[in-house]
């Protein structure tokens, strides 16, 4: 079975309902996902932090770009889904899942970039945390909801 954004979202939704209190709005537009990876530049071999991986739509594109991904996810149902859908990448070490709140869980120390589709309600506090931690990153790509961008 070939993975795509719509399939990953549908498989997660078959397991559980979307939790709007966690800001779970899943991105399925593969043109947007692809463009965000292209905008990030060459991620091959780079350690990328993804925040709020949800069903793995962005994760899929990061892995296809040969990034090494550490993905933080607060929702245990999404973690279980990711373990099922990306078991070979987890086994190979290309993907590490971190269950917890991105506002408080320790970030991996050796990340090169952050690429994330971040939930609206943590957008400002997350940006503040990254600025406070003075991380030395080659690139940060945040996909945000239109309301936050305005």
Where are these regions (language model features)?
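Catalytic cores of RNA-modifying enzymes
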Residues: 1-150
């Amino acid at each position: 079975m070939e993975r795509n954004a719509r399939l990953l979202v549908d498989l997660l939704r078959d397991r559980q309902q979307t939790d709007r209190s966690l800001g779970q709005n899943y991105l399925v537009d593969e043109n947007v996902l692809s463009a965000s990876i292209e905008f990030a530049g060459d991620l091959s071999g780079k350690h990328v932090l993804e925040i709020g991986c949800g069903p793995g739509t962005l994760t899929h594109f990061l892995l296809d770009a040969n990034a090494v991904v550490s993905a933080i996810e607060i929702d245990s149902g999404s973690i279980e889904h990711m373990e099922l859908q990306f078991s070979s990448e987890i086994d190979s070490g290309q993907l590490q899942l971190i269950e917890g709140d991105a506002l408080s869980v320790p970030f991996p120390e050796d990340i090169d970039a952050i690429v994330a589709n971040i939930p609206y309600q943590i957008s400002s506090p997350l940006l503040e945390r990254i600025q406070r931690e003075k991380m030395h990153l080659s690139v940060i790509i945040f996909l945000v909801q239109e309301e936050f961008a305005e």
